[in-house]
């Protein structure tokens, strides 16, 4: 066991050949293995893009924005780190080129460089090394994932900085792991190592000799091929590992352990640690692969359905809900813009309906139709952030009779702004980092479904929004049966809603950011449980005829 007071050791994870190989999952899985050996692990993601953070980037370009407790908008890989380990991510666990340059330029403006010419080397690289050391926070191991692909011009300052780190901290305190692709060429009937050889060659030209290679492949790489890779890449044969495609991401730590990766890391770092205790990972994988209660279909009604990375934490939180109920969750992505054409047949095929967060008016009328279908057919419903607001608008129009009810985000002239801009957001013009972000308290009402699911009176959840329920309409909604089950105790802001007599729950926050495979979030566990009960009830009766609901202008 590494004792406190010893130097932090650094594992640098780079990627080559193609993007989206799974560096984030590999880094998270390594963190899980090392943590299960009794080591304290922290993570850092370095992103080469010039945006200060991903908060203003399109989900189609970047995927999900993961929000931390301290209100940072970060890369989705931080979600993997939190789900796979006990480490808590903060804004210091994700840096971009833009943020690094911003720090350096601010120092230059303050005159901290004493009249020197500010350059990429040493000033930018020194700043990168400083944030690496800060992220360690006294942990035994800091795993640093460098985004992008080796060879990208944007990555060069980060690669130069991590090259220097080995000389700053010593050979035994820095290890380089390189993730590459070993593709199987069907026409030739064999695996090809040349892409890996060229990727490592490019990395070595930068001055980094990888200590170990993770070779992504859809099949086991034979020993003789690993020896060939080792020979051409100047790596010890025992340091070439198959990063095998597996059915569940929660099987990746077990797969890498079977390859002996964590033992090799202990050897390279020259540390002693206990054998990893992976029984709970084995249990999770068994529950994912062999659910006793079968399959349940959850319909996700959104507009980013073509890119599942847009809802990464949400998708995983639903899987966790399935684990909690010993069921397999099958996700059905339903394009809300297509629902606006009037055909709701896709909604009939699912056991529960979820409307996730989002921004912008496109697809909102389809989401409202999804809410209406769930309410009228008593299909379990879960609305998150914008999903809660869609539920409020749907009920205002179709139950309270408030024609034209809407959110001020979508219609500034609406006669009934049941969703309004938060007081603290009025006058805010900048887009980046200015929303209500991070963890805030939510007081739960006694006797409600929310209180029963959480088993607590007060919870803290992560937020990312500018708009809120308009409390001027609260009495009308309560008279119509809506229960405001969660409220911010400081501002009186509505955090949770529900309807009695069915599983119809909405929350203004993002509970998916706090769910883990070993600790499924109670709202997702309860939602999947309700979906299973609805599935079982539907199987006992003949299917109802699908209704087509007309789409009107704003209602």
From Swiss-Prot:
L-glutamine binds at residues 358, 386-389, 409, 466. One of its GO terms (biological process) is pyrimidine nucleobase biosynthetic process. Its EC number is 6.3.4.2. CTP binds at residues 19, 152-154, 192-197, 228. Residues 535-555 are annotated as: Disordered. GO terms for cellular component: cytosol. Residues 1-271 are annotated as: Amidoligase domain. Pathway: Pyrimidine metabolism; CTP biosynthesis via de novo pathway; CTP from UDP: step 2/2. It comes from Anaeromyxobacter dehalogenans (strain 2CP-1 / ATCC BAA-258). This is CTP synthase. NCBIfam families: PRK05380.1, PyrG. Allosterically activated by GTP, when glutamine is the substrate; GTP has no effect on the reaction when ammonia is the substrate. The allosteric effector GTP functions by stabilizing the protein conformation that binds the tetrahedral intermediate(s) formed during glutamine hydrolysis. Inhibited by the product CTP, via allosteric rather than competitive inhibition.
């Amino acid at each position: 066991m590494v004792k406190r007071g010893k130097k932090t050791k650094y594992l640098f994870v780079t990627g080559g050949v193609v993007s989206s190989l799974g560096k984030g999952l590999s880094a998270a899985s390594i963190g899980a293995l090392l943590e299960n050996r009794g080591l304290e692990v922290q993570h850092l993601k370095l992103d080469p893009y010039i945006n200060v953070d991903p908060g203003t980037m399109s989900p189609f370009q970047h995927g999900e924005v993961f929000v931390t407790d301290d209100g940072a908008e970060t890369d989705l890989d931080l979600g993997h780190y939190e789900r796979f380990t006990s480490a808590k991510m903060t804004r210091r666990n994700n840096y971009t080129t833009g943020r690094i340059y911003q720090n350096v330029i601010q120092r230059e403006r303050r005159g901290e460089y004493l009249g020197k010419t500010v350059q990429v080397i040493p000033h930018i690289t020194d700043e990168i090394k400083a944030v690496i050391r800060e992220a360690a926070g006294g942990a035994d191991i800091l795993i640093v994932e460098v985004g992008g692909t080796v060879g990208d011009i944007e990555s060069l300052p980060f690669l130069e900085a991590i090259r220097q780190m080995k000389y700053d901290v010593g050979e035994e305190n820095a290890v380089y792991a390189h993730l590459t692709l070993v593709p199987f060429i069907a026409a030739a009937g064999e695996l090809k190592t040349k892409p890996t050889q060229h990727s490592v060659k490019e990395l070595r030209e930068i001055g980094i000799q990888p200590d170990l290679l993770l070779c992504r492949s859809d099949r086991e790489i034979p020993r003789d091929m690993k020896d060939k890779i080792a020979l051409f890449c100047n790596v010890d044969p025992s340091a070439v590992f198959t990063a095998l495609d597996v059915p569940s991401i929660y099987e990746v730590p077990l797969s890498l352990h079977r390859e002996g990766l964590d033992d090799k890391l202990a050897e390279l770092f020259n540390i002693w640690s206990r054998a990893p205790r992976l029984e709970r990972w084995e249990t999770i994988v068994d529950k994912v692969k062999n659910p006793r209660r079968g399959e349940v279909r959850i319909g996700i009604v959104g507009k980013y359905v073509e890119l599942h990375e847009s809802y990464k934490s949400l998708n995983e939180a639903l899987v966790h809900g399935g684990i909690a109920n010993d069921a397999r969750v099958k996700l059905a992505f339903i394009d809300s813009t297509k629902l606006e054409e009037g055909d709701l047949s896709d909604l009939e095929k699912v056991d529960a309906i979820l409307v996730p967060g989002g921004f912008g008016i496109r697809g909102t009328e389809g989401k409202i139709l999804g809410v209406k279908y769930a309410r009228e057919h008593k299909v379990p419903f879960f609305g998150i952030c914008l999903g809660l607001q869609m539920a409020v608008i749907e009920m205002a129009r179709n139950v309270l009779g408030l024609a034209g009810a809407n959110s001020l985000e979508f219609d500034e002239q609406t006669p009934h702004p049941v969703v309004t801009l938060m007081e603290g957001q009025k006058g805010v013009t900048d887009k980046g980092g200015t929303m209500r972000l991070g963890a805030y308290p939510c007081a739960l009402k006694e006797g409600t479904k929310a209180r029963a699911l959480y088993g607590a009176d007060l919870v803290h959840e992560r937020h990312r929004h500018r708009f809120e329920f308009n409390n001027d309409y609260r009495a009308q909604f309560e008279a119509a049966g809506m229960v405001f089950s969660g409220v911010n105790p400081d501002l009186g802001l509505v955090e949770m809603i529900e309807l009695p007599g069915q599983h119809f729950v909405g929350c203004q926050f993002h509970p998916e950011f706090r769910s883990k495979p070993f600790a499924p979030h109670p709202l997702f566990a309860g939602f999947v449980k309700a979906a299973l009960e609805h599935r079982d009830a539907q199987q006992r009766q003949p299917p109802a005829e699908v209704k087509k609901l007309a789409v009107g202008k704003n209602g």
